[in-house]
């Protein structure tokens, strides 16, 4: 290894090696994409990063994060999760490791959160301009007959999330079906009604369009990521007893807002 390092150092060629900015990791059910690589010591990073995971049955360390989407613009989280505190922290299973700690479908998640589930991911496209993937997430819920999520994003900061779920039995009016953890410690602005809602916070907008009447609300949630260790969660609940829900969510990131 040392001799190889010296050989590389003495070889003629470019002074830097280009690093890949995107990759799919089938063994982990995960796609990682960046608009650019930046030095870790960069004082003001500006790259957009998108991470999507379905999870696999062979994992040894898991949370109920099947379908999780994380978006980071420079230093600013746009879509996030609750993170991982000490495993013995109060509320670890319910507030962090479980489905509630992630931007995923919320109805009857398989428990415990540490139980791996065989959720599949198909990469439809992946290149420097963005990507598009689809996931089958039904096995992560005890009640879902079908549960799919498609995610498409571009380097311009547009993320489109297409969710569809059907249940083996109707769920009650007021049941939360989806949620999104967003990178704002302050309350967000919510407007709309029925099947059409819009959400805005510093650095991003979110448009939610459903196939039936829903209620969109927010709440403050703890996290183990960075100070102040709290952020807002957007919740989407059905307005009447339902056997499923289709929800299209479009997030537009302000690429200039990096911190």
Which residue stretches match the model-derived regions?
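Extended polysaccharide-engagement surfaces of secreted carbohydrate-active enzymes
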Residues: 1-259
């Amino acid at each position: 290894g040392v001799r190889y390092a010296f050989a590389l150092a003495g070889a003629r060629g470019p002074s830097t090696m280009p690093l890949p900015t995107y990759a799919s990791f089938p063994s982990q059910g995960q796609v990682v994409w960046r608009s650019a690589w930046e030095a870790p010591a960069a004082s003001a990073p500006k790259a957009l990063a998108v991470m999507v995971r379905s999870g696999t049955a062979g994992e040894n360390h898991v949370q109920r994060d099947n379908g999780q989407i994380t978006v980071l613009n420079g230093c600013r989280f746009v879509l996030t999760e609750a993170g991982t505190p000490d495993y013995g922290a109060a509320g670890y299973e319910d507030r962090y490791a479980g489905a509630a700690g992630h931007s995923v479908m919320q109805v009857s998640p398989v428990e415990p959160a540490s139980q791996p589930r065989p959720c599949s991911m198909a990469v439809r496209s992946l290149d420097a301009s963005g990507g598009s993937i689809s996931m089958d997430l039904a096995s992560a819920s005890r009640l879902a007959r079908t549960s799919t999520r498609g995610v498409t994003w571009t380097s311009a900061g547009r993320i489109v999330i297409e969710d569809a779920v059907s249940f083996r039995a109707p769920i009650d009016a007021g049941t939360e079906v989806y949620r999104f953890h967003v990178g704002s410690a302050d309350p967000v602005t919510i407007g709309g009604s029925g099947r059409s809602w819009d959400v805005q916070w510093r650095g991003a907008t979110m448009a939610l369009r459903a196939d039936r009447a829903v209620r969109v609300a927010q709440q403050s949630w703890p996290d183990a990521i960075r100070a102040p260790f709290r952020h807002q969660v957007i919740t989407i609940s059905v307005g009447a007893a339902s056997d499923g829900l289709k929800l299209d969510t479009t997030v537009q990131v302000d690429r200039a807002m990096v911190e």
